[in-house]
């Protein structure tokens, strides 16, 4: 009777125990070769079969998990690289021109969860001309970040004293089309302010229209032709426009990450709310204004995840440059 009990009950239980112990001892590193055989025709055999099936399923799960984890790590590393590329290319030391009394400028870029290709720039074209750039590259990750570097570099290199900005964007567009294997495009706005006369020459390539605040007035959207995006089609000709700025006037430019910021109810922040926020803070200097706009966006979206960068720039023309005719 003992041997019967041992064969029918104890031995199958020992086989199951030994199999479980082997899995633990080997840290489940060899699940593919795991095998357990109990032929009793009862619940022990059913349990052994279930054990065998479980190890096969677990082996497949671990394989898939390894692949998914590796892919997530790759994507994470790529996004880190893209973030570093993006942030390293943007001027971020303020005040940017501490010795210049003719103007004040401030800009910020808050990257989204998925790194995009927003960029801004500002630089002296020569002693009396200040250029500002606001742009948004389509796509995400490293390709968008690298295309951002190319676009930003080309715009700055081709913005030369006395050049028409329409010609600048026409040349930049053709060059970008040649180096566009990913099929990306850039919306961009560039303006050059003559610090002596106050003339502001600008060109727009499918970008958001700026807000202008005249001295003593309020921020209002400045209606200009959007133009065609950069890198979208070769041979496009761009036309520059001009406006006259007086001391005390301000320009606010931004990317669509602001107006398209969305809350948990799928409502957009929108142009109207942006204009209201700018009007409430009309007397603030650029470095004070931009944090107020960002704070209002944050209060609107609350905890909703944003998938587009939030980028903005404000330029205040404070005084005419003297000593140059």
Residue locations for each model-derived region?
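HAMP signal relay modules and closely related sensory coiled-coil linkers
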Residues: 8-26, 30-56, 62
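… and, occasionally, acidic/histidine-rich disordered N-termini of signaling adaptors
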Residues: 64-252, 302-325
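Low-complexity, intrinsically disordered Gly/Pro/Thr-rich segments
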Residues: 292-303
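Hydrophobic alpha-helical membrane-associated segments
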Residues: 1-5, 156
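Short, charged, surface-exposed loops that flank catalytic or proteolytic processing sites
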Residues: 163-168, 281-290
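Cytochrome P450 core scaffold surrounding the K-helix E-X-X-R motif
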Residues: 212-216, 262-268
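Divalent-cation-assisted or electrostatically stabilized phosphate/pyrophosphate-binding catalytic cores
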Residues: 267-282
């Amino acid at each position: 009777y003992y041997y019967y009990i041992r064969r029918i009950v104890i031995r199958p239980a020992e086989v199951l125990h030994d199999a479980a112990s082997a899995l633990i001892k080997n840290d489940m590193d060899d699940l593919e070769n795991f095998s357990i055989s109990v032929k009793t025709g009862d619940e022990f055999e059913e349990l052994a079969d279930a054990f065998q099936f479980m190890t096969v399923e677990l082996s497949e799960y671990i394989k898939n998990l390894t692949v998914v984890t590796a892919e997530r790590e790759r994507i994470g590393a790529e996004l880190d690289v893209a973030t570093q590329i993006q942030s390293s290319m943007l001027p971020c030391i303020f005040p940017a021109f501490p010795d210049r009394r003719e103007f004040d400028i401030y800009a910020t870029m808050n990257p989204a969860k998925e790194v995009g290709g927003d960029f801004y720039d500002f630089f002296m074209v020569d002693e009396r001309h200040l250029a500002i750039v606001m742009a948004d590259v389509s796509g995400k990750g490293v390709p968008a970040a690298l295309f951002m570097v190319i676009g930003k570099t080309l715009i700055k290199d081709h913005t030369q004293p006395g050049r028409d900005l329409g010609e600048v964007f026409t040349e930049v567009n053709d060059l970008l089309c040649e180096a566009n294997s990913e099929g990306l495009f850039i919306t961009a706005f560039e303006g050059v302010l003559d610090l002596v006369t106050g003339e502001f020459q600008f060109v727009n390539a499918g970008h958001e229209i700026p807000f202008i605040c005249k001295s003593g007035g309020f921020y209002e959207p400045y209606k200009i032709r959007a133009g065609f995006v950069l890198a979208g089609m070769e041979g496009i000709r761009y036309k520059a426009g001009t406006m006259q700025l007086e001391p005390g006037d301000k320009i606010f430019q931004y990317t669509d990450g602001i107006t398209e910021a969305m809350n948990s109810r799928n409502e957009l922040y929108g142009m109207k709310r942006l204009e209201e926020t700018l009007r409430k803070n009309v007397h603030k200097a650029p470095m004070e204004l931009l944090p107020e706009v960002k704070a209002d966006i944050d209060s609107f979206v609350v905890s909703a995840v944003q998938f587009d960068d939030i980028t903005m720039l404000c330029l205040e023309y404070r005084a005419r440059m003297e000593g140059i005719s």
